[in-house]
């Protein structure tokens, strides 16, 4: 068993998650069984109650874990499913230790940060390694080395280095200030100094910068950080994140890591990277472009736009576009400031979300798509709003609404799941939604059925997608919606919950209560996203 810790220096948001995912990809291409863990030093037990603009998208695992968005990057790069155990938080560690103390499992000892908290961290890491039968485990430590909350995790990493085969990869920012015109290495030197003060010497430094570093700067980092120059790896600005594994391989990073771990190369078969490179090159080309709008409420943060709230939706669009030979131009539309100046946009996606903010803007967008034959894909909340819009403007139920938006609506076409009522009443919000993968039975002959069949994902008319919601289409309104032309393409196996809807005689008007973006990757696009993008090209 071998472990690779990925740490960060200088500033957060450098792309440690993409670095970790890229290393996973290239090591898997060498024939190794790999997996990854994300450590988040916040005190929340999981990411389920975090605001998307606070910490990015909540990634939902197959078994229903609400985790950090970086697990999404890991899954997309290795094309494998992870679990909630792959996301460790300070809250989760302390919760477990306190539970054990209350049960008397420490046999009366004084419970301390060292060894009890550090042992719990190491045990969580080792348990994931054992459960997945992995040969190499990557552990990304969120934040930066200088964060107070990271100290205990770095101490656990230091201890593990004495017990197992461990490599340390440090990701550092090397700025090139416009007025100075040269890369500055001093911040990297300082972050490595902090790391060494904690007993950790990095084996590799990934230099995140605007462009590749020259030999002069690499020599300087090598000297002051006591690291071989060949282990200083370039991570320049790139057009698509899927290019990074290829950039790392050009620098022989996988071979260097395996040598450091005293592991032999299992294979030189890079066929999967060839296909990866082909799809990546499509996303970089300038000629064949499709313009797609994503309407959301978690886009703005202060005076800036941050797409991380919908990162999986954005990536799923890219996967489908690459499969079809196109590069997407994504237009982010703030639903609280909607302007229906959309003629140049070839298709619209309304992703998931919660609450009442920006709802009317999304409803106006759906009306525009339905009436103007603009391809539309609704996800989770997107399905619910598509139903509300249809009920109001086609079925004549002018006050139709969701009880999440208006508790007193006379026509609750969207209502809370029965099993969720007491949960909400008692304010038990964490990890209590309809979470994880669920089956749906598809109706033969529908667009949805044909798309899943095209990708060979149907067995006995059943498909599986991940979910995260409390509200559903109210069964009392099934008949009036269907009588007015809405097609229910898929139900839960018991026939109670509508999982997919579509409109006939429309270029593409499809919505799902699920989150198909969570099962999409560069080599295997989501059928719904594929169908949506394909319709945008017609």
Predicted segments with their positions:
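Flexible phosphate-sensing "switch/lid" loops adjacent to ATP/NTP-binding sites
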Residues: 1-328, 336-347, 355, 361-368, ...
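Cysteine-nucleophile active-site neighborhood
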Residues: 11-17, 21-25, 29, 317, ...
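Pocket-forming structural segment of enzyme catalytic cores
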Residues: 70-79, 336-337, 388-499, 535-537
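C-terminal cap of thioredoxin/glutaredoxin-like
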Residues: 164-166, 507, 525, 529-533
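Short, contiguous acidic/charged loop-to-helix segments that flank catalytic cores in large enzymes
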Residues: 301-304, 353-358, 464-468, 517-524
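Active-site beta-strand termini and strand-to-loop segments that position acidic
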Residues: 501-506
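Short FAD-binding loop at a beta-strand-to-alpha-helix junction that anchors the flavin cofactor
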Residues: 508-514
């Amino acid at each position: 068993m071998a472990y690779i810790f990925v740490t960060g220096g200088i500033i957060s948001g450098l792309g440690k998650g993409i670095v970790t995912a890229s290393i996973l990809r290239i090591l898997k291409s060498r024939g190794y069984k790999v997996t990854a863990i994300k450590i988040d030093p916040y005190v929340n037990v999981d990411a389920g109650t975090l605001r998307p603009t606070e910490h990015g998208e909540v990634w939902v695992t197959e078994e229903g874990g609400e985790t950090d968005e970086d697990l999404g990057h890991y899954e997309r790069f290795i094309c494998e499913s992870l679990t909630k155990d792959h996301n460790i938080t300070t809250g989760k560690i302390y919760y477990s230790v306190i539970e054990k103390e209350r049960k008397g499992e420490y046999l009366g000892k004084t419970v301390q940060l060292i060894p009890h908290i550090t042992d719990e961290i190491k045990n969580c890491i080792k348990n994931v390694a054992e459960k997945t039968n992995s040969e190499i485990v990557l552990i990304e430590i969120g934040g930066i080395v200088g964060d107070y909350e990271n100290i205990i995790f770095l101490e656990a990493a230091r201890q593990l280095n004495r017990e197992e085969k461990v490599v340390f990869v440090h990701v550092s920012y090397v700025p090139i200030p416009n007025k100075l015109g040269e890369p500055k290495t001093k911040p990297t030197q300082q972050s490595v100094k902090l790391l060494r003060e904690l007993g950790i010497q990095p084996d590799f430094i990934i230099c995140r910068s605007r462009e590749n570093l020259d030999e002069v700067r690499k020599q300087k980092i090598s000297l002051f950080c006591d690291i071989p120059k060949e282990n200083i790896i370039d991570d320049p600005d790139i057009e698509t994140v899927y290019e990074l594994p290829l950039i790392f391989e050009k620098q022989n990073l996988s071979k260097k890591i395996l040598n450091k771990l005293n592991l032999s190369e299992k294979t030189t078969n890079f066929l999967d990277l060839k296909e990866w490179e082909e799809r990546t090159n499509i996303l970089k080309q300038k000629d064949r472009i499709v313009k797609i709008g994503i309407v959301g409420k978690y886009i703005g943060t202060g005076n800036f736009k941050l797409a991380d709230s919908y990162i999986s939706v954005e990536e799923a669009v890219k996967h489908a576009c690459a499969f079809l030979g196109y590069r997407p131009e994504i237009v982010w539309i703030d639903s609280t400031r909607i302007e229906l100046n959309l003629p140049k946009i070839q298709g619209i996606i309304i992703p998931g979300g919660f609450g009442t903010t920006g709802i009317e803007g999304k409803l106006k967008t759906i009306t525009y798509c339905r009436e103007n034959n603009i391809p539309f894909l609704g996800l989770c909340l997107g399905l619910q709003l598509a139903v509300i819009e249809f009920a109001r403007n086609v079925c004549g139920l002018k006050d139709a609404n969701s009880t999440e938006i208006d508790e007193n609506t006379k026509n609750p076409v969207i209502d809370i799941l029965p099993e969720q009522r007491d949960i909400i009443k008692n304010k038990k919000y964490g990890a209590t939604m309809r979470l994880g993968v669920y089956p749906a039975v598809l109706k033969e002959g529908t667009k949805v059925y044909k798309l899943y069949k095209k990708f060979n994902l149907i067995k006995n008319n059943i498909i599986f997608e991940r979910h995260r919601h409390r509200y559903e289409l109210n069964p009392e309104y099934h008949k009036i919606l269907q009588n007015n032309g809405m097609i229910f393409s898929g139900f839960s196996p018991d026939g109670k919950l509508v999982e997919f809807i579509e409109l006939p005689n429309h270029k593409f008007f499809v919505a799902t209560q699920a989150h198909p973006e969570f099962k999409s990757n560069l080599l295997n696009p989501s059928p719904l996203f594929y169908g949506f993008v394909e319709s945008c090209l017609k």
